[in-house]
Amino acid sequence: MNFDKLHHLFEKIKKEWKEDSHVEHEFRNKQYTTDLGQISMEIPFLHNKYLNHYTDLSQVKTSLEFELRKTIKEKREYYGGEAEARTYAEKPFGSSIKTSEKMRVYLDADEDIINIEAKVKYVEMMLNYLDHVLKQVSARNYHVKNAIEWERFINGN
């Protein structure tokens, strides 16, 4: 998955949460209990929606981590002079690297590795956002309960 797709997906998720998290402070026709009941009934569906997003992104992260491990192995072979001859024909490399310190420098600066690591970090940021969204969805039960208790208090019940 490229950065544009990840960014588009993240913007879509944030837009969905902005819409889903909005609660009218002025409840329709002052029917507090009905509106709060509706909000309460939507909580499991919201939780499922954002849990699915979280699960999908966790799978993307796992795939990227596997891709990163594979790429690091290929780059170690390339920089160490152990890759296939056709690899060097396509992308020549002057000499093989013998020290682990120098290998680390080349791996840390490799563009392919940097791009995959950047995607992993971006997906981690998205997962962190979704983790907070899921906590807010779970907390909605308590917010609805408090609002209903407030309504009872105001009405003298």
State the predicted function of each range.
Residues M1-F27:
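Extended, charged low-complexity scaffolding/tethering segments
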Residues D20-T55:
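Short, charge-rich amphipathic alpha-helices with coiled-coil/heptad character
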Residues M41-G80:
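Short, well-structured hydrophobic secondary-structure segments
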Residues R69-N115:
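Extended, amphipathic alpha-helical coiled-coil scaffold segments used for oligomerization/tethering
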Residues M103-L127, R152-N157:
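Long amphipathic all-alpha helical oligomerization modules
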Residues E124-N157:
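Alpha-helical oligomerization segments
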